From Swiss-Prot:
Higher taxonomy: Bacteria, Pseudomonadati, Pseudomonadota, Gammaproteobacteria, Enterobacterales
Source species of the chain: Buchnera aphidicola subsp. Schizaphis graminum (strain Sg)
Membrane-protein topology: Multi-pass membrane protein
Classification via InterPro entries: ABC3_permease_C, Lipoprotein-release_system
Transmembrane spans: 22-42, 270-290, 312-332, 379-399
UniProt-recorded name of the protein: Uncharacterized membrane protein BUsg_286
Swiss-Prot/TrEMBL GO biological process terms: lipoprotein localization to outer membrane
Length: 413
């Protein structure tokens, strides 16, 4: 490998640093590129963390998908769940029963939904990320006359574990004119922390309760499923349809919360485009530095051409020279961004400790709902994209340098 172009470019770089104007522009270019990349890394890490928190705080308590059978005589819910659980993308599936009811306690009443669950192990798993305020992790077995309620309901009715409540359940499965209304007494077995509207008015009751009192052993046409990657729900649903090979209706969480998923993509695109425009502007200053250097070194270029240097050598010299600014700015931005993300909690702790009276630190969003998560794929995209912009930006100075006529230049001296 010929290192001559690189060595000449290095010498040219150090010589131009003695020129204060060129030095100032080069420093500002590096700062612009590094700040843009630093901001890109922080923004992408925040959005990646936001996706993780959505998965934990919202998608943990919602079915990722619901399958509705069109013909229960051809397939039972047990047949479908066996097929579903053979797919690696599906973590768990079970019958989906949701009924309307009225909760009565201490002269208070509230309309709530009651939902079935079949396996306590998976209920514990999906709420495992929460703070152990209600000893939810100790829950081992639940009977058909016991219920798990949300913290919002517990607060509204002043309930605690072991309290008894009355539920009037409305069963619409029969028909509108024969709607079955029944009253039941339940013991509060445990309480889970609510994550907002999605599960604030819900109670979880064992599936055996619905089998016993509503005679729905095989008359179930809906199955809920939880996926390993909820953000790929559309693709997983299509794979399920090919696997089952029977007419079914499919729903997934994106139909109800599609705006969250699309907003993340839109915000990520806007940040990406905006900051890369800043990088492009910074690269224009690199172009000006290269052109300034070329205009001052026309005599040297002419001498090199006269002693046998070809176009490729001249182009490589100024290619290395221009890319040096972009690579240095790129690496500074990447390193500072990665270090900041990895030490984000320590930085926030330090700021909170030393700025206790600071109004900004008391009211910012990160305290409650911000997680920074580095994605290696994002780092590669940022690095390669910046280098690509740098190569394109350096094209004109390289072309200009290679077209210098040595005869015309040397005649002037």
């Amino acid at each position: 490998m010929n290192f001559l172009p690189f060595l000449i470019a290095k010498r040219l770089y150090h010589r131009n640093n003695k020129n204060h104007a060129v030095l100032l522009v080069s420093i500002l270019s590096k700062i612009g590129i590094s700040i843009s990349i630093f901001t890109l890394i922080l923004s992408f890490s925040a959005l990646n963390g936001f996706q993780i928190l959505i998965k934990k705080n919202i998608l943990s308590s919602l079915p990722h998908g619901i399958i509705e059978l069109t013909n229960t005589s051809a397939f039972t819910w047990k047949d479908i769940t066996k097929k579903l659980e053979s797919l690696p993308e599906v973590i768990y599936s079970e019958p989906y029963v949701l009924m309307n009811s009225v909760l009565l306690k201490n002269d208070k009443m509230r309309f709530i939904n009651i939902k079935s669950f079949k396996n306590i192990k998976y209920i514990k798993k999906y709420f495992s990320f929460q703070k152990k305020l209600y000893n939810f992790s100790k829950l081992k077995k639940i009977y058909n006359n016991e219920i798990i309620i949300s913290s919002d309901l517990a607060k509204y009715f002043s309930l605690k574990e072991g309290d008894c409540i009355n539920l009037i359940i409305l069963n619409k499965k029969i028909s509108f004119d024969k709607t079955q209304i029944q009253s039941f007494s339940f013991k509060v077995k445990s309480i889970f922390h609510s994550n907002g509207i999605s599960n604030s008015n819900i109670g979880l009751i064992p599936f055996i309760f619905f089998q016993k009192f509503f005679n729905i052993k095989n008359n179930i046409n809906k199955i809920e499923l939880y996926m390993s990657d909820p953000f790929q729900a559309d693709k997983i649903i299509l794979k399920i349809a090919k696997k089952i090979k029977t007419p079914l209706f499919f729903y997934n969480w994106m139909y109800s919360y599609k705006y969250i998923y699309h907003d993340i993509k839109i915000i990520k695109t806007i940040i990406y485009v905006t900051l890369f425009l800043i990088i492009i502007i910074s690269c224009f200053s690199v172009i000006s530095i290269c052109l300034t250097s070329i205009s001052k070194k026309t005599k040297d270029i002419a001498i090199l051409r006269s002693i046998g240097a070809n176009n490729i050598l001249i182009q490589l010299i100024f290619f290395y020279y221009g890319m040096r600014f972009i690579i240095i700015g790129n690496l500074i931005g990447l390193l500072t961004g990665i270090i900041t993300v990895l030490n984000f909690k320590k930085i926030m702790f330090f700021l909170e400790k030393h700025f206790e009276e600071n109004w900004f630190l008391k009211n910012v969003y990160y305290k409650n709902f911000l997680l920074l998560q580095i994605n290696f794929f994002d780092l590669i995209i940022i690095f390669i994209s910046t280098l690509t912009i740098g190569i394109v930006a350096n094209w004109y100075p390289i072309y200009y340098a290679s077209k210098i006529n040595p005869n015309k230049i040397l005649k002037e001296y």
